Amino acid sequence: MAVSLFIPLYAIAILALIPMLFAKRKIGYCITAFFTGLLTVLCGFYFCGSAPNLFNESQKSYTESFRSLVQHMDKTYVLKEWKAVDFAALEAKYLPAVQTAEQEQDAVKFMNAVQEFCNELHDGHIYASCEIGPEEEKQSAFHQHEYGLSMVQLDSGDVIAVCTAEEVRKLGIEDGTVITQWNGKPVLQAAAEDVPDYGIPVKANADRIAPMYLSALGGDTVDVTFLDKSGREQTVTLSDLGECRTAHEAMDAFSHAPKFETPEDYQTFLDQNFSAKMLDDKCGYLILNAETLSSDPMGLKNIAGYLMGDQKYAREIFRTRLNELKAQGMEYLVVDLRNNMGGFDEIGCALCDLLTDQEWYGQGLGIRKNGQYTCVSDHGVHGTGEFKDLPVVALTNYNCASAGDGTSLYLSKLPNVTLAGITDPCGCNQETGGTCVLSGGVVTVGYPVGLVMDETGVPNVDTKADRISRNPVEVRIPLDLDAAMAIFRDKKDYELEWAVQYLEQ
């Protein structure tokens, strides 16, 4: 869940203009001035209540700002106890690298240390935003190379080449070729030992995509061992072809991720939210790529639903979409949550309202004090029963995060809904709001400070230190050779095709 901390400030600025419209009307001016003042005070209190989690350490040195970051997170990171985080141990582990970066005045080394520190927490809501150029990026510990292929692990355990370039195909490695070694190591061993920790919350998700990351790791050259068409091992040396493209292409194909190359692409993605259509004469299709109302630019409807625990506006949109599909002959439905960017869990609950006639616990908003959790507001699913008998498959993946993670969980509780995917949801759903700007503004770290709990009083989705998914898919979509070729070579939406076939059967 991501609630913008600055919406109250925007609201205050706009509210201040309202009395001007009634400047020549004595009664109207008094009334609007009173309510404007009241709303301004409320918005001010809301912002001030959030402000303690904003920390500016930009005037301090690398070492001092890093130590301050650790202290702030030790006090305010909402999942410190849940994930059993030892901040003192992490500070001791990464402080030498930070001190070296300070001695050498090396911003990239500082960035690396902070990023690796953040990744140790395995929280999808923790980020380290870094201000570096393309040349500095090449020195990053997370720099990726381009060797003209990517790799994916099948359910069988085999690792195959995908998205192969012409330079690689000439050497005998084609889409579907089994890769056995990477730079002299068994390929899965190399994926486990050499791929950096990217902070992915669910370890099973990280393991699944590790070969894709591995395909971009090496030096100016990399030795790749594969099985030729006769089944014999061959080894070739691949050269770095420049800027990394293939690994990104493979990840986009695997997650069915949208392209964000232009502002128009991003707007198209947002415009698809809440959209619906018929895939055939029986199967409806609903996209939910963010739990926000794009028709609400000020965010007031979003916030109203959050505060009231009831998103009536979203529920009415869902009701309209589903009734339109029903009128076109819908007998079953696919809800697409893949790459869901999150927002407000109440929107996910509003969809569930229509798909059940039962009462279900949704989320509990709480506070953390002295390492203890206290729930202060319960939000739930209040079934209307309108589509309680509609068979539904909800597609999710490792890029479905935050409120999308929550929506995956809530939908999976309904008996007529099957949560499915090749991977599990991301594994994070706490409220963001903690921000710390480090030395010189080189790195800004964000992390969650608001608590979202389940009915037992613990974080509702987020993984513990074991990194085991707590809202796994109910049905794992198979990934065999044919599926991989459909995804990576033919660029088909294999998961969606699978979902339709599943519902038909």
Residue ranges and their predicted role:
Residues 2-332, 501-505:
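Flexible, low-complexity junctional segments that flank or bridge functional domains
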Residues 5-6, 10, 19-20, 26, ...:
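C-terminal "post-core" interaction segments
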